Regions:
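Short amphipathic alpha-helical segments, especially helix-boundary/capping motifs
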Residues: 12-15, 258-261, 388-391, 410-411, ...
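Pre-P-loop entry segment of helicase/translocase ATPase cores
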Residues: 348-353, 358-375
């Protein structure tokens, strides 16, 4: 396990994981299962820990990276998509233990052992929930930190450049970055009730999508990193502070104070009745654009998209460099307790995490290519039995559709790709649509007549 140390002596382990919810799957239960999983992880870690999830979205150009030699039609297929832009995503989960003494030289063997036990527990929880996750080693951890520092997630080699910082953006070499804090603690504009998903209208039909689905399609960007940080404080201490706040508001009766008292009572009731956990959270979006791109267009898109969900982006994120540095993997405890964190319940905090995954090619020796919703080829094992995740041991399937619906077009494409991979095919058809295909491949053609 690669471990990141900060100058204050905090140490962190980084997991590369895959979000469990398939994009556009319309499965509401999977969003709630994600919420339950990460709420349980917060309970497992407890006081003095933080989870720091980073979802990285990168605009790339499609390039066929398979080493196989293709026949003419397959070569033409991949050439057609060459250079097409699409969004790729990757997710990292950093688990950090705070060093209260704020010194690199205050090593505590007992705390270190507790840290190693808990990070392995989190890994087991993710694995038991069916989430793909693996710890980054020393070299991968170093590479990820360097890429984050340069905000470069697509080039094979990464170079460091100087920073030029103002109140609005951070300039670094051939790109500019801007950090958008989701919540202004002086004016927390969040909906009073939050769910882990929102509904999108598709052809007059409601479809559930991630509450934060807007972060993966921001126009004009090179890279986007959605930062989600949850800090686990001492529960008794926070409840005592809440009680003091309630009494202070109650001592000065006016409408706003009475509303505050009611809100605090409601939170205390939920904690007592349902054993909920109080957490501090911070969310921000780091956007990277080319120097000749107007970043205001991205700003307008983000503000409008989040405004529709009832979340209003902070307009006072003038501490750009501080936010960027404290968003580094393992450096989250540098976030200001007064201005960059806000208190809420753990399940509400987890609801604002990004939960979806973008489709990637399957890990299988048998590849049949389809285009995904972004219009780029994705390899799928349609047999369901050759890949790493075996779904069945029966490779039969049935193609049904009315005349002119494209059955032959699909079957010809699929048979061609399967034949290129030395697959034996038995094709049963009503009519003689595939007689020519059979002759082309020197197959055996059997027909029946009454």
């Amino acid at each position: 396990i690669g471990v990141v140390y900060t100058k204050n002596g905090d140490y962190s382990a980084i997991l590369r994981m895959e979000n469990p919810v398939q994009k556009y799957s319309a499965n509401i239960d999977s969003y709630y299962e994600f919420t339950q999983l990460f709420t349980a992880i917060c309970q497992t870690l407890g006081e003095g820990y933080a989870i720091h999830k980073q979802d990285v979205f990168t605009r790339k150009q499609f390039k066929d990276e398979s080493t196989d030699k293709h026949e003419f039609l397959s070569e033409a297929y991949f050439r057609y998509y060459e250079g097409r832009e699409y969004t790729d995503s990757s997710t990292y989960l950093t688990i950090t233990q705070e060093n209260k003494k704020s010194s690199l030289f205050s090593f505590d063997h007992k705390k270190w052992r507790d840290f190693m036990v808990k990070v392995r527990k989190v890994h087991d929880q993710l694995k038991d929930a069916g989430v793909k996750a693996s710890f980054l080693g020393k070299q991968d951890t170093q590479e990820y930190v360097d890429r984050f520092f340069a905000m470069n997630f697509r080039d094979k080699t990464v170079s460091m450049t100087g920073f030029k910082v103002d109140e609005e953006t951070i300039g670094m070499g051939d790109r500019r970055c801007k950090v958008y804090s989701l919540v202004d603690v002086d004016c927390a504009n969040l909906p009073s009730v939050i769910r882990p998903y929102t509904n999108m209208e598709v052809n007059s039909t409601s479809m559930p999508v991630d509450l934060l689905s807007v972060v993966d399609n921001i126009p004009g960007v090179q890279s986007v990193v959605y930062i989600q940080i949850i800090f686990m404080p001492n529960q008794k201490k926070e409840l005592a502070v809440l009680d003091k706040k309630k009494n202070r508001h109650a001592s000065m009766p006016n409408p706003s104070n009475l509303i505050a008292v009611e809100d605090i009572k409601r939170v205390q009731d939920v904690i007592a009745r349902e054993n909920k956990q109080l957490v501090y959270t911070h969310y921000n979006i780091i956007v990277s654009v080319a120097p000749n791109v107007d970043i205001q267009k991205s700003t307008n898109h983000i503000e409008n998209a989040f405004g529709r969900t009832g979340i209003h982006i902070s307009k006072r994120a003038y501490n750009q460099l501080e936010l960027f540095v404290n968003s580094f993997p393992g450096n989250c405890f540098g976030m200001s307790e007064d201005y960059d964190r806000f208190l809420t319940l753990s399940d509400a905090a987890v609801s604002m995490m990004y939960k979806e995954k973008i489709v990637h090619s399957e890990d299988t020796p048998f590849k049949v290519y389809y285009t995904d919703r972004q219009g780029v080829p994705v390899a799928i094992d349609i047999s369901g039995k050759e890949g790493k995740n075996k779904l069945t041991d029966n490779s039969n399937f049935f193609v049904l559709g009315p005349s002119g619906s494209g059955k032959s077009f699909y079957v010809n494409s699929m048979v061609r790709q399967a034949h290129e991979q030395n697959t034996d095919i038995v094709l049963v058809d009503t009519g003689n649509s595939y007689e020519g295909l059979c002759e082309y491949f020197n197959g055996k053609y059997i027909s029946y007549t009454e």
